[in-house]
Amino acid sequence: MEIILIKPVRKLGKIGDILKVANGFGRNYLLPQKLAIRATKSNKELIVKQKHEFEAKDKQIRAEVEKINTLIKDQQLVFIRQTSDDCKLFGSVTNKDIADKLSKNISYNISHSNVILDKQIKSTGIYTVEIRLHAELTAIVTVIVARSDSEAQDYLREQKTENSADLAESE
């Protein structure tokens, strides 16, 4: 299937790119998510005319996303959860939990699909989580999962001492 991207797609292309993709990928993902349109003759002509408008719109979106990135950068999200004796959570911390808490902290709606987790968080500790705000821009957030506020503070102190030790080594 031949498509034209109308939004940038990570690891695929930028606005206005004409690509051949698998039929299922185009029909089931790119077209319904309004990331692309079919590459018909009329659409190709239309895209050539509107490419500058799309690029200007993308720059505007990117500038807005960079502002959000500065708000997100260096955020530390603390989750207090019940655990078993061996620090395993009863349940897990999911990308939706992280998106909800982050949205509340920065007063901007972050979708759970923007939160990139390799797997759900199922034990206490400190985790780094990637937030994909734009096809080319990601932010890193620290997630702390603990049994109590005091344990979360201990994790924070431990992380600060590790960071200061890393800085001393690099100098």
From Swiss-Prot:
Provide the Gene Ontology terms for cellular component.
ribonucleoprotein complex; ribosome
A Pfam family it matches: Ribosomal_L9_N
In which domain of life is the source organism classified?
Bacteria
Molecular-function annotations in GO? rRNA binding; structural constituent of ribosome
Q: Which residues form the signal peptide?
A: none
For this UniProt record, give its keywords in alphabetical order, as a comma-separated list. Ribonucleoprotein, Ribosomal protein, RNA-binding, rRNA-binding
GO annotation terms (biological process): translation
Family of the protein in this entry: Belongs to the bacterial ribosomal protein bL9 family.
Q: What does this protein do?
A: Binds to the 23S rRNA.
> HAMAP family recorded for this chain?
Ribosomal_bL9
Q: What is the protein name stated in its UniProt record? A: Large ribosomal subunit protein bL9
